[in-house]
Amino acid sequence: MRFQSFPRLLGLLLTVLLSTGCGAPPTPSAPRTAVPPPSATQQPVAPTSGYPAPATAPAGGTTLDTALSTPASAPGAAGCRSQGAPVSPYRVVATYPHDPTAYTEGLLYLGADTLYEGTGDWQNSLLREVTLSSGQIKREVKLREVAPPQPGAQANFGEGVAVVGDRIFQLTWQSGFGLIYDRASFTVLKRFTYPPAGIALPVEGWGLSYDGTRLIMSDGTAKLYFIDPEATFNTGVLALTGQVEVRDTGVPITQLNELEYVKGAIYANLWNCDLIARIDPATGAVQTYLDLSGLRTLLPITPNVTPEVLNGIAYDATGDRLLVTGKWWPSLFEIALPVARTYLPLALVAPPPPLTPLHWS
């Protein structure tokens, strides 16, 4: 007696087993609860299956692989809390050194392990280029040197920064103007002024980002302003093209600060909060929040430095990494967000090929 179709039968059995065990989505699990950061004596918490696998930190960075999650009702710093939009979990992937004297107002990732950072402070506002992995400052310019104040006037306070092609735009807080630098040399090409104060116009400069077409600006209110960068450069006046009010379930969300455009959404720091709001640029609706107040427990103690509010968001589109830090923070964190999972319905799974009749002899 000889069995001629054993390989085909074995393939059929494997197909049946796999389709019955893996074809359907899992049942919903209970809501996640807050997971505290690891202490010095605890091992890091293993990541949940909803996150991408942790990356290996480059030289100078430390892989933390710490799972952190916050329930939707939990407050952030200074009693901040969601009005109704959900709070997303996140995971700390790595930590990098950050200048604890930097009063961070703007943060950008340019690739090649390089950050651009704009800082505030009346006497120490800067635009600088920094190596992410080491925190080393490659070059910098001081606002008080490239844009000295008028005699008797207060110094200029630097704010958000954005890169548009070979130019860098930087805002000032209350001086009524911004600067446009040549990206290669860090020399000032031009100043641009804010329009006269009005009900629909930005009065102060806070956060700045670029969506590939428009600059996006915040002024500490609930408004986001859309700006034509080329017209701004050509005219020397902020060229406003539109605006949107940011709301969470109908409630205006004020004090929008540093901004970053990420995958079609605007991520905004909220001043005096350790929250980041994810905003739909078309409607202004807050889609989700990140409550990053737990990052404070991971900051090393630095003599003579008291970390202030979370501020600074940079996105690495190539590596799909989100980088965050704060004012006078000695660390910068790479965080990962949950990955949406999809499942193939059983009806779409290709049926096995028809069986060949068995031949016995």
Predicted regions and their residues:
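Ser/Thr-rich, Proline-interspersed low-complexity disordered segments
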Residues: 13, 22-87, 342-360
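A short helix->beta-strand "capping" segment at the edge of beta-propeller domains
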Residues: 79-101, 134-135
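Beta-strand-rich domains and repeat architectures in extracellular enzymes and scaffolds
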Residues: 93-126, 146-147, 152-162, 326-330
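Surface loop/turn motifs at the tips and blade-to-blade linkers of beta-strand repeat domains
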Residues: 95-100, 141-153, 191-201, 244-251, ...
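Signature of short aromatic-glycine-proline-rich micro-motifs recurring in repeat-based ectodomains
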Residues: 104, 158, 256, 303-314
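Conserved beta-strand position repeated across blades of beta-propeller domains
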Residues: 108, 162, 207-209, 260, ...
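Short coil/turn segments that connect the beta-strands within blades of beta-propeller domains
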Residues: 112-113, 165-166, 212-213, 263-264, ...
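Conserved beta-strand positions in repeat-built beta-propeller and related beta-rich domains
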Residues: 115-122, 163, 168-175, 215-221, ...
